[in-house]
Regions:
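Aromatic-rich carbohydrate-binding modules that target alpha-glucans
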Residues: 12-61, 71-98
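Extracellular ectodomain segments of secreted/surface proteins
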Residues: 1-12
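Short, conserved beta-strand segments of beta-strand-rich sandwich/propeller modules, principally
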Residues: 63-65
Length: 98
């Protein structure tokens, strides 16, 4: 799931990337164009409602490819992404548009 809210007074958007708690065990991160596909940049944190999430502030009116990556190296897709695109290595990336 993806939630967005504008950052007041700036041309930026706070994007929350959210996964159901049962989707993965162990560490999972959101990786994408916005963080150089670095799995250490944005790990999802467990929430009291059973989900895992992380918020990332991104420039408004841009399109970003992303995926979730768990600690075993398994890629996860976001069923609520704004779109999907081939990633050039035989897979598909999720897309978020701010």
């Amino acid at each position: 799931m993806i939630k967005q809210s504008p950052v007041k007074g700036k041309d930026k958007v706070k994007v929350s990337f959210i996964l159901p708690g049962e989707a993965v065990t162990g560490t999972v991160s959101v990786v994408g164009d916005f963080n150089g596909w670095d799995p250490t940049a944005h790990p999802l944190r467990a929430r009291s409602n059973g989900t895992r999430s992380v918020a990332v502030t991104l420039p408004a009116q841009h399109r970003f490819a992303f995926r979730y990556l768990d600690e075993s190296g398994r890629w996860l897709d976001d069923d609520a992404a704004h779109g999907y695109e081939e990633n050039g290595v035989g897979g598909v990336n999720s897309v978020v548009t701010t």
